[in-house]
């Protein structure tokens, strides 16, 4: 078996997660064309170092194809990042990217007492 990337939370105050589904037309594009659009997205993400981004495939686990998560201490930076990404070419190939779930980081030991 191949090695899988392990995503380790950075313990920033806010975690924003949402599923997304790409349109069929996305998969009909050449790999090179898709990569060019994703490179634009990635470049935009690098402009916001206060926001960590992780994308994971989830096809077959639920209705969505992928999940994306953002960790930040500055929700205003997340909003600026998403606003900029929504005007890029890859956005035209997104069929659905809701619901958006926003969480505040809590250590597990602090929340497990709620379930006793």
In which residue ranges do the predicted regions lie?
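Short S/T/G/P-rich N-terminal loop/turn motif that feeds into the first structured element of a domain
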Residues: 1-47, 59, 109-116
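Short, well-ordered beta-strand segments in beta-rich or mixed alpha/beta enzyme
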Residues: 15-21, 60-85
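Generic "edge-of-domain/loop-turn" microfeature
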Residues: 25, 75-77, 107
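An amphipathic, aromatic/His-enriched active-site/gating alpha helix that lines ligand/cofactor pockets
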Residues: 47-50, 73-102
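A short linear hydrophobic-aromatic micro-motif
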Residues: 51-57
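A general secondary-structure junction signal
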Residues: 57-59, 104
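Short terminal or interdomain "cap/linker" segment that borders an active site or interface and mediates
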Residues: 71, 104-113
């Amino acid at each position: 078996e191949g090695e899988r990337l392990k995503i380790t939370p950075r313990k920033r105050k806010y975690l924003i997660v949402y599923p997304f589904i790409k349109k069929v037309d996305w998969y009909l594009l050449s790999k090179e064309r898709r990569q060019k659009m994703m490179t634009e997205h990635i470049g935009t993400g690098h402009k916001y170092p206060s926001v960590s981004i992780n994308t994971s495939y989830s096809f077959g686990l639920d209705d969505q194809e992928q999940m994306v998560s953002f960790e930040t201490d500055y929700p205003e930076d997340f909003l600026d990042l998403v606003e900029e990404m929504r005007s890029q070419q890859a956005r035209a190939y997104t069929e659905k990217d809701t619901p958006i779930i926003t969480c505040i980081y809590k250590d597990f030991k602090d929340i497990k007492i709620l379930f006793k």
